[in-house]
Regions:
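Acidic, glycine-rich calcium-binding repeat modules characteristic of RTX/beta-roll
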Residues: 58-74, 79-83, 87-239
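Generic beta-strand structural signal
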Residues: 47, 84, 176, 267-268
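Generic structural detector for well-ordered beta-strands
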Residues: 53, 210, 223, 285-287
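A generic structural signal for beta-strand entry/edge sites
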Residues: 51, 219, 269-273
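N-terminal segments that cap or nucleate solenoid repeat domains
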Residues: 2-90
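Short, surface-exposed beta-strand/loop "edge" segments at domain boundaries and coil↔beta transitions
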Residues: 49-51, 91, 190-192, 230-233, ...
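Low-complexity acidic/polar repeat-biased segments
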Residues: 1-39, 238-303
Length: 303
């Protein structure tokens, strides 16, 4: 899909770092910063704001397949910046607004209690925002992204990714590859007055997950849970009007720290509203495509 704004770069090139942030001198550590019970299997940082890179071979398995810290890293308190190695690693943000970068390997990253930024890097990664309004970037390879609670922004990046907003009003970008956007039946919202939107001051309120770069040519699909199939839903094409148009740009969310020059600008867009036929509840919105372009797949509730 074409970008609404020429001010943005391709979503696949965006990194979840503050613009101008210097991380060239970040310390590389191989020992926990807080002593812990070895039975916990956790590599602990501190209750403060830590900025660290994990040395290779610390969280990953040794040649015998044994890891000294099988439960991964826990950042504890503070607004942390944690960068992993090329190993497959598990890292948890816990409290604070954390940034966790997996780099290489098949990583598992959890945000924790606040508003976090998770960046998978290369490898088939699992990213889970948990609480707060999180930014999740899968980047290369085939990733699974879950927003958790809060209003999250999920970007798959290159590869065939699976994006699940979970609770909250989430924005989903698959980027390159054949992606699956999962709309959970148990998080659907009651039908508003105008099929997806209540009107306030001439603007439509977005109350459901919003898929912003669905691409049928690349093989994107909508995942349905709760035993629903394409026969159990209703597709309605509508035009909606919203403010802060940069938040809904098909090229992806604005990289953190950049000046948001398109905030407060109003835009109208054609969307397909997906509702459950039996209840009328809204499962989600898809920007810029007609109902005929959408393909659906049943998805397990045990995800």
């Amino acid at each position: 899909m074409q970008s609404i704004s020429s001010e943005t770069e391709s979503v696949s090139n965006q990194l979840p770092r503050q613009v101008g942030e210097d991380i060239s001198s970040i310390p590389v550590i191989s020992q926990p910063l807080t002593p812990g019970d070895m039975k916990s299997g956790l590599f602990l940082l501190t209750e403060n704001a830590d900025t660290v890179e994990i040395a290779p071979g610390v969280l990953g398995s040794n040649p015998l397949g044994i890891s000294k810290y099988p439960n991964g890293l826990a950042a504890l308190g503070g607004d942390d910046y944690v960068r992993g190695s090329t190993d497959p690693e598990a890292m948890k943000g816990n409290q604070g607004n954390d940034t966790i970068e997996g780099q290489g390997g098949n990583d598992t990253l959890w945000g924790g209690q606040d508003s976090d930024v998770l960046y998978g890097g290369t490898g088939d990664d699992l990213l889970s925002g948990n609480l707060g309004n999180d930014y999740l970037f899968g980047d290369a390879d085939n990733d699974l992204l879950r927003g958790g609670q809060g209003d999250d922004a999920l970007v798959g990046g290159a590869g065939n990714d699976t994006l699940i907003g979970d609770l909250g009003v989430d924005r989903l970008w698959g980027s390159e590859g054949a992606d699956v956007f999962v709309l959970r039946t148990d998080t659907a919202t009651p039908p508003p007055v105008d099929c997806g939107c209540g009107n306030v001051d001439g603007l439509d309120e977005i109350t459901s997950d919003f898929i912003l770069d669905y691409n049928s040519v690349q093989g994107d699909r909508i995942g349905l849970t709760g035993g629903l199939t394409a026969n159990d839903i209703v597709l309605t094409q509508k035009t909606i009007t919203y403010g802060d148009r940069r938040d809904y740009d098909s090229s992806g969310p604005l990289p953190l720290g950049q000046i948001r020059t398109l905030d407060f600008q109003i835009e109208s867009a054609s969307v397909t509203v997906i509702t459950e036929a039996k209840t009328g509840n809204v499962l989600g919105l898809v920007k810029g495509v007609s109902p005929a372009q959408l393909q659906f797949v049943s998805f397990s509730d045990s995800i």
